[in-house]
Structures are given as structure tokens and as C-alpha cells.
Amino acid sequence: MLELVRQTAPLPAWSDVKSFSLHDLRPLKPVSVAVTHERARLLATSGGLQVRQGTRSQVLREGQFMPLEPGHVTLESGGGAQAVIFEGSWGDELGGCGIFRADNVAAPSDKGDPVAYAKHTNIDAHYHDCQEFWLLLEGAATSVVSGQHLAMTPGDCLPIPMGAVHDMPDAPVPVKAVYFETTLRGQKRTGHLWQHTHGPAVQMEGK
């Protein structure tokens, strides 16, 4: 049975992501962060920020991301920003990463797998050849993973096993969220996979 994870709680043993942290940056107030795992990825979730680590410096805008090395990282923003850092152990072939939005609409379209529950959003039921992690930044939603319904609020992270059919059928408060797809495995197909097109979904972990 899956559980939602908050920032200070451990993720499942099978998870590629071992920890995550959200950072709200005030203007001209640098923040130092210690990266402790072998792999890390920073994603800008609002505004613009400068990331400095060792001799590297990179400016990111909302939706852009970069890898981090173990060690100290300095984050700074001229006008305020937010970023999330995922840490863990994953391979070199990854799926997607970014920000998505969802809200309830009058006539939702659905090209994904058929479902038995009511659909109110345009998010389709699908699976991946990798693990995926959803982190809710704004709004409220119900997500479904392998038939299990989970109510999400800001700060909740949902670890989704490889091959698990998942969906966000209800977003009564418009949602802004992060998605991070980790190591591609098996057939290493990218994007949304549907059983009616790509074959049966086989959940690999978290049963």
C-alpha cells in the first residue's frame, strides 16, 4: 500500500528518490544546502534563481533543472523563487522532469486507459517504464495509483512504482505540481504508456 511522503519522512525502500527538499528563496537572501546522496537534481519551481556549486554557476527559470554533485550548494534569487531538490540513486537514462498543472473541467478528455471512477481533469490514466514522483506545490487533488485513492495537499510527495497505472482524476483546487521520472528500465519507453496501446502494465515495486 502506497503512502504520501512529506519532506522529513523516509521514502519507500524501493524508491530511486531517497529524499527531497523544498526551498523558498527570499530576494537577495542566499541559502546553503548540503547534498548528501550520490545523485541529485534541482528543479526551479517558480521565479528565477542562481545555483552555485564549486566552480559551477547556473541561472534557472521555472521549469528548468540541473544535476547537482554531493557537497554544498548555494541558491540565490534577486526577486524571490522556489526550487526543489531530489536526492537518491538513479541511472543515467531518465524519463521526464518538470511542472504540470491540473484542474477540474466541464468536459474532461481522456485518451488514457478506461477507469471505473469519475474523471474531472484532463490527466489521463497511464503508466511508465520508470518510477515517477509527484510533488504537489499548490492546490488539492485526488490521485489514483493501482486503484488506491490518495488525497494530496501542498507538500505531499507521491512515489509511483514502475508499471503502476496512475491518474489525477480530481483537482477541486487547481493544482501545480512537480513530476520527476527516474531510471528507465525494461523496454525503456518514454512518455505516457497505455495498456490499450502499449500492452499490459506490470507494477514492479510497492505491492
Question: Model-predicted segments: where are they?
Answer:
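Generic N-terminal amphipathic/basic segments
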Residues: 1-16, 30-33, 37-50, 56-59, ...
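A short glycine-rich, His/Asp/Glu-containing loop-to-beta-strand
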Residues: 2-34, 88-126, 130-131, 182
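Double-stranded beta-helix
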Residues: 3-5, 78-115, 171-207
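Residue "hotspots" at secondary-structure boundaries inside conserved domains
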Residues: 23, 33, 42, 58-59, ...
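Short, conserved beta-strand element in jelly-roll/cupin
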Residues: 36-50, 127-143, 183
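Structural motif
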Residues: 48, 72, 140-142, 149, ...
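Short acidic-glycine-tyrosine-enriched beta hairpin
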Residues: 54-71, 146-163
